[in-house]
Amino acid sequence: MFLKDYKKTALILKDQKIDYTHLINQVNSFSTLLPNNNLSKVAIFSENRFEWVYAFYSVWMKKAVAVPIDFMSSAEDVSFILNDCKPEVIFYSNGTKEICEKAIAQLNHKIDKINLDEIKIEESKVNATFPEANPNETAVIIYTSGTTGSPKGVMLSYDNLLVNIEAVTTDVNVYKEEDKVMVLLPLHHIFPLMGTMVIPLSVGGTIVFSPSMASEDIMATLQHGITIIIGVPRLYNLIRKGIRDKINKSGIA
């Protein structure tokens, strides 16, 4: 439903390219790390990377609910989220390991940990398919930043996501199979999650990761032939500032 084998490149980061066949095989392999029984929710606490995508879709393959967490969250906020939604498993990275461990230490319930940087499994080449999801079932829980108090979880159903997909692929043909979409904003936000991952991959497009929000990384990523950039005013201000700072340092202006 959300991921098909389009026989083309699905993910790009610098000179690394992952095709849809490899993507689906990796998702299936990641799903084998998750328990078969008593799995309702899985948290993802990591910076943007290929493994973030594998982890996310592996949760859906298990018919569980994905809970993305801001990789810059404090241990207190992570602990609050984990205690609030009580996922059975959390994916994390070396970059978030310290915060993750501090957060888990504050919990009164058990949670299994999977480090994305330590996963060593043979790629599964089983012809795996995603199970049909009930449109009314919860697909993902998105937590607010907690700027006005503790983070609050928003439950979105598969139907919520499908309505968004259809709005920009069928009703208005914004996303097409030939598009290359830049992944720049953190994927724990619903806007980039849908706009730079779920929607482009659902139509067979290619998503291209920028290593950072630095202007030089963005410019290098654009060389891959980007056709869609998803951003917010603050992001564009950062890009503008980076460019102006470079110009000022060069003495051109």
Predicted regions and their residues:
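AMP-dependent adenylate-forming
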Residues: 1-18, 148
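Conserved AMP-binding/adenylate-forming
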Residues: 16, 31-73
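Conserved AMP-binding A3 loop
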Residues: 19-21, 139-165
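ATP-dependent adenylate-forming carboxylate-activation enzymes
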Residues: 26, 46, 67-80, 94-96, ...
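Short hydrophobic alpha-helices that are characteristic scaffold elements of the AMP-binding
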Residues: 56-64, 84, 198-202, 240
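ANL superfamily adenylate-forming
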Residues: 95-135, 243-253
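Conserved pre-ATP/AMP-binding loop-to-beta segment of ANL
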Residues: 125-143, 150, 174-180
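Conserved AMP-binding/adenylation subdomain of ANL enzymes
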Residues: 162-180, 187-253
